[in-house]
Regions:
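A short LG(V/I)-centered, amphipathic sequence patch enriched
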Residues: 40-57, 62
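The N-cap/first-turn positions of alpha helices
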Residues: 2-5, 29, 61, 68
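Helix-turn-helix DNA-binding elements, focusing on the entry/boundary residues of the two helices
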Residues: 17-18, 36, 50
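Short helix-boundary/capping micro-motifs
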Residues: 11-26
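Core residues of bacterial helix-turn-helix
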Residues: 24-25, 36, 43, 64
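Short alpha-helical "packing" element that flanks the helix-turn-helix/winged-helix DNA-binding module
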Residues: 8-12, 64
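Short glycine/serine/threonine-biased micro-segments
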Residues: 14, 28-29, 52, 59
């Protein structure tokens, strides 16, 4: 698994926002979204719930997040 994707996941969860995580990491919001979609494809299940108010871990994401 790509360490850049894991770092992006950690930032998105910590900041609660793809936009803020992308700004912090120097990516576009669209690029970070693509990274998260790719990460979810890699692991085979959704790890984030996306909403207008931000992002948070799914129950499955909560189980794997400590490994990040």
């Amino acid at each position: 698994m790509d360490t850049k994707k894991l770092a992006a996941l950690a930032a998105a969860v910590r900041l609660g926002s793809f936009t803020r995580a992308a700004e912090e990491l120097g990516y576009t919001q669209s690029g970070l979204t693509h990274m998260m979609n790719s990460l979810e494809k890699d692991v085979g299940f959704p790890v984030l719930v996306r909403s207008r108010s931000g992002v948070r871990l799914t129950p499955a994401g909560q189980r794997i997040f400590p490994l990040v």
